Swiss-Prot record:
PANTHER family tied to this protein: UDP-N-ACETYLGLUCOSAMINE 1-CARBOXYVINYLTRANSFERASE
Catalytic activity: phosphoenolpyruvate + UDP-N-acetyl-alpha-D-glucosamine = UDP-N-acetyl-3-O-(1-carboxyvinyl)-alpha-D-glucosamine + phosphate
Organism of derivation: Aliivibrio salmonicida (strain LFI1238) (Vibrio salmonicida (strain LFI1238))
Family to which this protein belongs: Belongs to the EPSP synthase family. MurA subfamily.
UniProt-recorded Gene Ontology molecular function terms: UDP-N-acetylglucosamine 1-carboxyvinyltransferase activity
Protein's recorded name: UDP-N-acetylglucosamine 1-carboxyvinyltransferase
Length: 422
């Protein structure tokens, strides 16, 4: 087991950071490669624990996978149609194997998934979508089992609620369905758009991605192709917040402002100077006063729930108060008690947190509770007075590619240490 040991400083975090590919696009794209009868190459895939788990799962299913810069996948000889519990238990994204398996092979089963403990994220919407495409679904022995005689059938589907995961499942499965599928009330996130671009690169006919109505014209087979994963907008936002709360200046490279317009608008409202070009975003907080902002999470293009914890920290350190309202997940304020251990000011009322006017943070031993919350603890440690130990950093490794190296390049004093060394 590893932990982060951070020596806090009042020195601003400043410099350049290269943003990795988006985890939330890379994972569905890697699973969607199961649809392809010929080899595919996926570039700009981040080096993350969840990516490693996905690659191992694809290999268990019979795909040939290698990584040499890009990830190369040959799913032409897939011969196992079951995603087992020992892999799925660590990663909720494993459910994305089900749609491609049943669409291409007529059958598939996936153990009920695990992942971050941030509330109920049931697979009901995935199941209902596949059933509307003609699949028969059973829940047996802890597995979701899907079958279809012949091909799936295109359908007009109206999602009961906006769901990124279920939108991806239905969109991928419908590519090999007979006929046209119209998916209404679809999620609009950039990662869904990127997954659709990958599907089209291997021969699918997907249109309307990025709107709430996606149209998929089914084809008989999908071939091979090349795709480069879109930049990680959440990693981008995380480093921009790190600069903002430390009074620094950072340039994020290999990313695009169009991916996180709602986040950039709130950073400007908080007092930061934000500029951008074709493939970079800069934030300058030098000599500026940090002001608390009101945040309400909602599906894209509104403010993303995955940036909520980082802005909770920003509000705590700003001239406040600022109100954070979480509408996507329940139980997503687990980072607040940990930040309070460091001296942060916040009050929680249901799905709302009121925070601001914290007079500095003090280093403490804190525990990462989920992926994005853990990032806020790491940033807090960088700006706190004294030493901070962040435990259970495997959560961070699920979504951030070498976060300690990138923070070190910005001037942070952070190291990964074995628990036995502390």
């Amino acid at each position: 087991m590893y932990k982060f040991r951070i020596q806090g400083s009042d020195k601003p975090l400043s410099g350049e950071v290269t943003i990795s590919g988006a985890k939330n696009a890379a994972l569905p794209i890697l699973f969607a490669a199961l649809l392809a009868e010929e080899p595919v190459e996926v570039a700009n895939v981040p080096k993350l624990r969840d990516v490693d788990t996905t690659i191992e799962l694809l290999q268990r299913l019979g795909a040939k996978v290698s990584r040499n810069g890009s990830v190369h996948i040959d799913a032409s000889e897939v011969n196992n149609f079951c995603a087992p519990y020992d892999l799925v238990k660590t990663m909720r994204a494993s459910i994305w194997a089900l749609g491609p398996l049943v669409a291409r092979f007529g059958k598939g089963q996936v153990s009920l998934p695990g992942g971050c403990a941030i509330g109920a994220r049931p697979v009901d919407l995935h199941i209902h979508g596949l059933e509307q495409l003609g699949a028969t679904i059973k829940l047996e022995d802890g597995y979701v089992k899907a079958e279809v005689d012949g091909r799936l059938k295109g359908a007009h589907i109206v999602m009961d609620k906006v769901s990124v995961g279920a939108t991806i499942t239905v969109m991928c499965a419908a590519t090999l369905a007979e006929g046209t599928t119209i998916l209404e009330n679809a999620a609009r996130e950039p990662e869904i758009v990127d997954t659709a671009h990958f599907l089209n690169a291997i021969g699918a006919k997907v249109s309307g991605m990025g709107t709430d109505t996606i149209t998929i014209e089914g084809v008989e087979r999908l071939g091979g192709g090349y795709h480069e994963v879109v930049a990680d907008r959440i990693e981008t936002g995380t480093f921009l917040v790190a600069a903002a709360v430390s009074g620094g200046k950072v340039v994020c490279k290999n990313t695009k402002a169009s991916l996180l317009e709602s986040v950039l608008a709130k950073l400007e409202e908080a007092g930061a100077k934000v500029e951008s070009g074709e493939d970079w975003i800069s934030l300058d907080m030098t000599g500026r006063e940090l002001k608390a902002v009101n945040i309400r999470t909602a599906p894209h293009p509104a403010f993303p729930t995955d940036m909520q914890a980082q802005f909770t920290l920003l509000n705590m350190m700003a001239k406040g108060p600022g109100i954070i309202t979480e509408t996507i997940f329940e139980n997503r304020f687990m980072h607040i008690p940990e930040l309070q251990r460091m001296g942060a000011h916040a009050e929680i009322e249901g799905n709302t947190a009121i925070c601001g006017d914290t007079d500095g943070l003090s280093g403490a031993q804190v525990m990462a509770t989920d992926l994005r919350a853990s990032a806020s603890l790491v940033i807090a440690g960088c700006i706190a007075k004294g030493e901070t130990i962040v435990d259970r950093i495997y959560h961070i490794d699920r979504g951030y590619d070498k976060i300690e190296d990138k923070l070190t390049a910005l001037g942070a004093n952070i190291e990964r240490v074995r628990s036995s060394e502390l």
